[in-house]
Amino acid sequence: MLCTAALAATCGLAACGSSQTSSSGASTSKRTDFVLGGLFPETGSLSYVAPAQMAAFKLAAQDINAAGGVLGKSIATTIADVSDADHADQNTAGLQSVLSKNPSVIVGNPSSGVVKNTYHEAEGSKVVMISNGATAASLSGISDYFYRTVPPDTVQGAVLADTIAQDGVQKLAIACFNDEAGNGIRDVVVKHLQSAGVDIVYGEKESFDPTEKNFSSLASSIKASNPDAVLVIAFDQTVPLIKSLSSVGVNTKHLYFFDGNMSDYSKTLDAGMLEGDKGTVPGAIATAEFRKRLKTIDSSLTTYTFSAETYDAVILAALAAQKGGSTDSGTVKDNLASVSGTDGGTKCTSYRACVTALKNGKDITYSGLAGIGPFNTKHDPSSASIGVFTYDASNLPQFDHSQTGKVS
């Protein structure tokens, strides 16, 4: 779920039965004020990823207004903090704050657990929610009103498992937190690795409490399982967990990570501690030009977690309203798939270019920064890239290669 500053510096990835056809007349009473809602984890275990996502959200709104807005009117924005899945009260409070502004769409949250805690209320209010980072496979097709600009864990999990197996690991231990995101990708990785003949010596079913602060017992259990390598699936628990593993003699140069903790550890861990370790990140890598533009919004940015996916979610929603001729959320819902390219049409790479094509009566395929394929019938991207990264001697992740996967 993450794309850090270091990653960016090196290279820039149950059907609900909803219709995939566009609907230019979805609303019986046309609305013309587009209100863009945002839900981001400004507090909690994912707070370090919020700044870049909020910057991308604001940059997309700025670009939309610079191109004439939606239906000729500038859009308004509203943002609320939803924290993480361990703070359900804040999940609800944040959502209700945004819903009170009568949004045309809500972009966020990047946490699968938070989405699980909030999508029902958004659906009940008939407001579209587009997640910029929730990857749990269980979210595919969960609601007519839920979309996402990242692929489900089935894609990243397969690439991560292939990376581990191709490195020759025979015995793998897994340290996984008990969270929707953690358990989801863990299960995908385990399935693929067992098919490849890799023995899961610890963590096939075990998981730790996300609020845990002391990892000495877990580290000792992993050490006792005598693994060749350890897959660490956690958020802000990662640093203390790695330190605990090191303290009991686990080789921290044989670790693997997923998007939730592929981060810059140059200031939090001793130099060389992660050298050679690998991990995967779904979605696109923020390009140098995009990073430069984001810094005009927030000059303090050092990590670019799902910033491209956030930007594209905003643009897609605005284009859906523009195509449908109304800014109510029902119209946005009914036109999202079409502007993503399910109907084919003129390829366009910016809001301005896409709006011009729509005004000329053309169908469009928005080809944005995230590089995803058109939405499928489960409201997932039909294809997406997964980046594979290797840590250098400074504990910075460096891009190695990417693999494009199709979403079933």
Please state what every model-predicted region is:
Residues 1-408:
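Extracytosolic ligand-binding ectodomains
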